[in-house]
């Protein structure tokens, strides 16, 4: 489990990215890199890390489900993810 402060920091970054997305796009299109540099650092989408919604784990993140591989495996075994079954052949 990631620390709550790390999860909160990432959520704060996501909110900043959403708030400045239109402004960033407009400045990029105009080529105004000086004004772009004045925006907050955390408003850049590259600073947001994909994290598991349950544990906050950053590695082994499955984008399609929004959870880590460990949580995915547990939930799939318990049948909590619709349409996901263990493979057998």
Curated annotation (Swiss-Prot):
GO CC term (a single one): small ribosomal subunit
Keywords associated with the record: Ribonucleoprotein, Ribosomal protein, RNA-binding, rRNA-binding
One Gene Ontology molecular-function label: rRNA binding
One Pfam match: Ribosomal_S14
Organism superkingdom: Bacteria
One of the protein's GO biological processes: translation
UniProt function note: Binds 16S rRNA, required for the assembly of 30S particles and may also be responsible for determining the conformation of the 16S rRNA at the A site.
Quaternary structure annotation from Swiss-Prot or TrEMBL: Part of the 30S ribosomal subunit. Contacts proteins S3 and S10.
PANTHER family reported for this sequence: 30S RIBOSOMAL PROTEIN S14, SMALL RIBOSOMAL SUBUNIT PROTEIN US14M
Record-stated family: Belongs to the universal ribosomal protein uS14 family.
Protein name, as recorded: Small ribosomal subunit protein uS14
Species of the source: Amoebophilus asiaticus (strain 5a2)
Gene: rpsN
């Amino acid at each position: 489990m990631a620390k709550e402060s790390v999860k909160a920091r990432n959520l704060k970054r996501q909110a900043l990215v959403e708030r400045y997305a239109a402004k960033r796009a407009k400045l990029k299109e105009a080529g105004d890199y000086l004004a772009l540099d004045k925006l907050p650092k955390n408003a850049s989408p590259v600073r947001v890390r994909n994290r598991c919604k349950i544990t906050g784990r950053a590695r082994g993140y499955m984008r399609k489900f929004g959870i880590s591989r460990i949580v995915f495996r547990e939930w799939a075994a318990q049948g909590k993810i619709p349409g996901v079954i263990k493979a057998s052949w």
